[in-house]
């Protein structure tokens, strides 16, 4: 959202392509349920996320295509039956991993139900938009052979991996792909029901990661101007009817909703030297577990259970399963710490090795030195 707002369309599209190889299709016909979690819902209306991503695709396409190159091959070959969203997704991510990929599509054009139904019959998306996504995938070195109806698995001898993305009702020689040994079934055929384009993309990506035995994408974290983010709070701005929606509150970079909605002020944002963003801590003694923070959280979390919890007594800590800390020796800065279900101890400024990750140590150090009033 930030890059689109700043007019950096190429960079925005490159981030989208890390996890979504069909930006034109999803930017046009996805159900955009991401907008249900947008913090702007609590102000006036959600940010037009899908629209902004389509703008990135449309305006960043030529620049990305000019630089897109297939990676060095790994020596493996994969055949994918079906050029719908799941098959195209798997093809893209396998190709990114260096696999030589060929997609076989029985129809005369690729795109699956998006092309045959949503485009040709419903008119919800243009053939040109679908074609641009397919061109992106082909630019990664993927070959797509249309008019190829594969009826037997032995037709694909010589491939190291064979994936079937034939849809929920798709058959191979009268048999369900799931009943044919050696086939990796993805998409709606894997789910056993008609799903969404986004779910099919995700399944294709999961299949590629399982085959490659490694992640095929990375998370991109952009630094935010926190003062600019804070300055937008409380401003009621309706979404524009067209064009870029600039109202994003950048919850991916600065999210402190749980500190604002807690009626007991049991969640607190703490600036920690050396860390990019303020860190959320949970104050056990102030929480009555009303669940407000979970209801308003735009992420899939429950801050009153997930965030590092500051306990006042050993009994309170023993009665909880939260990750958390308890100051046991104020004079030496010694803490009892629970992380990932394991108990350990940590001393601020101590010389002994610690099992705690550096961000956790920095947070504990900051609390002890600058926010000691929350520790007892």
Model-predicted regions and their roles:
Residues 89, 93, 261, 296:
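Rossmann-fold NAD(P)-dependent oxidoreductase module
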């Amino acid at each position: 959202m930030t890059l689109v707002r700043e007019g950096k369309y190429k960079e925005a599209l490159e981030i989208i392509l890390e996890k979504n190889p069909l930006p034109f299709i999803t930017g046009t016909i996805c159900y955009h349920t991401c907008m249900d979690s947008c913090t702007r819902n609590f102000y006036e209306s959600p940010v037009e996320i899908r629209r902004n991503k389509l703008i990135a695709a449309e305006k960043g396409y030529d620049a990305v295509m000019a630089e897109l190159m297939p990676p060095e091959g790994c020596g493996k070959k994969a055949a994918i039956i079906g050029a719908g969203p799941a098959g195209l997704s798997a093809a893209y991510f396998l190709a990114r991993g260096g696999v030589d990929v060929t997609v076989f599509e029985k129809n005369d054009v690729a795109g699956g139900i998006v092309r045959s139904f949503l485009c040709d019959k419903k008119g919800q998306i243009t053939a040109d938009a679908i074609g641009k996504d397919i061109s992106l995938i082909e630019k990664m070195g993927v070959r797509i052979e249309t008019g190829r109806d594969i009826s037997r698995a032995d037709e694909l001898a010589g491939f190291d991996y064979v994936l079937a993305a034939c849809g929920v009702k798709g058959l191979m020689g009268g048999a369900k792909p799931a009943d044919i040994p050696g086939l990796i079934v993805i998409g709606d055929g894997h789910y056993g029901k008609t799903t969404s384009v986004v779910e099919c993309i995700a399944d294709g990506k999961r299949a590629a990661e399982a085959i490659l035995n490694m992640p095929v994408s990375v998370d991109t974290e952009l630094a935010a101007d926190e003062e600019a983010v804070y300055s937008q709070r409380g401003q009621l701005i309706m979404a524009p009817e067209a064009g870029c929606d600039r109202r994003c509150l950048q919850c991916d970079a600065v999210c402190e909703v749980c500190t604002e909605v807690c009626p007991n002020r049991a969640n607190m944002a703490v600036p920690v030297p050396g860390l990019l963003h303020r860190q959320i801590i949970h104050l056990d003694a102030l929480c009555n577990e009303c669940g407000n923070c979970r209801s308003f959280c735009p992420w899939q979390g429950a801050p009153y259970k997930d965030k590092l919890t500051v306990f006042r007594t050993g009994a309170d800590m023993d009665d909880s399963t939260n990750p958390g800390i308890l100051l046991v020796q104020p004079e030496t800065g010694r803490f009892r710490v629970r992380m990932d279900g394991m108990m350990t101890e940590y001393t601020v400024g101590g010389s002994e090795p610690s099992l705690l990750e550096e961000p956790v140590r920095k947070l504990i150090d900051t609390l002890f030195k600058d926010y000691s009033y929350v520790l007892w």
